[in-house]
A protein has these predicted regions:
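N-proximal short alpha-helices
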Residues: 24, 28, 89-90
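Acidic/histidine-rich, surface-exposed loop or edge segments in extracytoplasmic proteins
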Residues: 36-39, 92-102
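A cross-family detector of function-defining hotspots
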Residues: 40, 45-87, 99, 107-155, ...
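N-terminal Sec-pathway targeting helices
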Residues: 1-19, 26
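Ser/Thr/Pro/Gly-rich low-complexity linker/stalk segments immediately outside membranes or between
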Residues: 26-47
Length: 164
């Protein structure tokens, strides 16, 4: 009988610890990933979910993906788009090394990273990458969009946005 009572208390204590651990994980996950509205974020008048003008873009048939086509702008080959094969809508954009194109927030490649921090919400996560690069990550939970801004020495090097 004493053995049964001892096991009962052990089971209750283990259950309480697991419940508190799960609660702590949920609270930390929601606190770390605060929301930023990215549904209207544009690079050169294009946003996630829009259709592209195929006359301005060329498709890369050498890149084979199951669900997506890869396009780049004819005039700006460093502006790359991922387009859903079924819907024809943009699901991802990447801008690298092209200082002519800018976002609707009035920043572009080569600008100071403080422009990004001022124009966007303070709801970002900063990560250190290799070779001195860092990234700012903005998450839009409602529209399921992620924005990555890669920078080095406080200068924007890459802008990437895509559906989660």
């Amino acid at each position: 009988m004493k053995l049964f009572k001892r096991f009962k208390w052990i089971i209750v204590v283990v259950f309480m610890l697991v419940a508190m651990g799960a609660l702590l994980l949920i609270v930390n996950h929601n606190r770390l990933h605060t929301n930023t509205n990215l549904s209207n974020f544009k690079i050169d008048k294009l946003k996630i979910g829009s259709k592209i003008n195929k006359h301005k873009f060329e498709r890369h048939d050498d890149v084979l993906l199951k669900k997506f086509y890869v396009y780049s702008m004819v005039d700006h080959p460093d502006f790359i788009l991922l387009v859903n094969k079924r819907s024809g809508k943009v699901v991802g954009m990447s801008l690298l090394n092209d200082k002519d194109l800018q976002t609707n927030c009035n920043w572009k490649i080569g600008d100071d990273i403080s422009k990004v921090k001022v124009s966007m919400d303070a709801n970002y996560k900063e990560k250190s990458l290799h070779n001195g690069f860092k990234s700012l990550i903005f998450i839009d939970k409602k529209h399921k969009i992620k924005l990555f801004i890669v920078h080095k020495e406080n200068k924007i090097k890459k802008i990437e946005i895509h559906n989660k």
